[in-house]
């Protein structure tokens, strides 16, 4: 709509004025082509991104200790294979722009809105996995909701599964479950192996389990100093 086009024009004009970035328009499609330096130079990408978000993930002189938005956002969207889904990145930013900016914040996006964006991206990603691809994942994560803080020892997962009789439940419905765990016959160890192969968890060098934020937040697991899990 006209409002969106006006915002797009403002963004391009700001890029040209502040960063000397000239946008060209494709003659056939009329699409705007991002300047080469904005596509390939990380320093330029960071500067433009921080012109939108501000330079830190917290206010005050020590805000840098919480991280820098340009790296903080993708780092919190990484899966266990060290990959970021473009859909998750766009979902996080789409959610972030919905929040009102505090009067004393001089940038279009506030760091708390970016954190809320990660929560939304996590909700969407987990919903995709549990509803569309691997419904059994929801069943193995439900007993852990609100009861585990990562990184943690593997027994914190397996003991809760034992209390919930998760493995028995999966075995009883194995034939009816779409894409059941491949290593279910190995019990809890096999389930952990499947979660790791899907990129949902990581096994650290010391044997503890870590879960990327893009999954952890929606699955309701805690992490000290991390984005708050959904309730």
Task: Name the predicted role of every residue range.
Residues 1-64:
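The catalytic "switch" region of P-loop NTPases
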Residues 36-231:
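C-terminal leucine-rich, beta-strand-based interaction scaffolds used for sensing/assembly
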């Amino acid at each position: 709509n006209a409002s969106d086009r006006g915002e797009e024009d403002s963004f391009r004009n700001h890029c040209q004025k502040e960063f000397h970035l000239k946008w060209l328009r494709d003659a056939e499609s009329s699409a705007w082509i991002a300047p080469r330096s904005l596509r390939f130079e990380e320093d330029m990408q960071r500067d433009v991104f921080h012109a939108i978000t501000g330079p830190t993930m917290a206010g005050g002189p020590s805000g840098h200790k919480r991280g820098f938005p340009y790296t903080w956002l993708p780092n919190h969207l990484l899966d266990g294979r060290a990959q970021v889904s473009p859909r998750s990145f766009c979902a996080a930013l789409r959610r972030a722009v919905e929040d009102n900016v505090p009067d004393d914040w001089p940038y279009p996006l506030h760091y708390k809105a970016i954190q809320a964006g990660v929560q939304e991206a996590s909700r969407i990603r987990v919903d995709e996995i549990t509803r569309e691809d691997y419904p059994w994942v929801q069943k193995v994560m439900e007993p852990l909701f609100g009861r585990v803080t990562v990184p943690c020892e593997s027994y914190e997962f397996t003991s809760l599964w034992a209390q919930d009789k998760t493995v028995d439940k999966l075995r009883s419905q194995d034939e009816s479950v779409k894409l059941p765990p491949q290593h279910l016959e190995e019990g809890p160890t096999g389930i952990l192996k499947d979660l790791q192969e899907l990129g949902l968890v990581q096994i650290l060098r010391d044997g503890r389990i870590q879960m990327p934020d893009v999954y952890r937040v929606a699955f309701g697991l805690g992490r000290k100093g991390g984005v708050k899990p959904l309730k």
